[in-house]
Amino acid sequence: MLFRSGEEEKSEQEPLKIWGKIEGDKIVKTDDISITSQCIRVPVSDGHTAAVFMSFKDGVKKPTVEEIIDIWSNYSGRAQELDLPSAPKHFLHYFTEPDRPQIKSERNLENGMAVSVGRLRPDTQYDYKFVCMSHNTLRGAAGGAVLLAELLCAEGYMD
């Protein structure tokens, strides 16, 4: 296994920025969620896999497994609304098979731009747990940058 210093901290902090908001000239991280992580690198050619454990805030009605899958299955983001060239038609794909998602099977789904999710089930310590995976280069670094540029152009921030 390879170890990269700072990777776990980054995976805990970056989503808080992404889901945060801009106030003045600063990004204010969201405080709606709490993330903890442990990163383990294994020798695969392409793909990142995450085991996710989640709980809902007190006072929030906990959705059922079926409701969560329905939300994921019907999710459409701004990239889909604008029909951007690099955007997958369906950003999230939920798999009902107990052994999915798998990197070799799903990494190139929708030209590598989709996120594959599966194994959503109740957890004994948290409300739910699930597994998700995406292509680290196509959805991640390179493809993510292209999609972001397409979005900036479509929204009028770039020519």
Predicted regions and their residues:
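C-terminal substrate-binding/catalytic lobe of Rossmann-fold NAD(P)-dependent oxidoreductases
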Residues: 1-129
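NAD(P)-dependent Rossmann-like dehydrogenase/reductase catalytic/cofactor-binding core
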Residues: 109-159
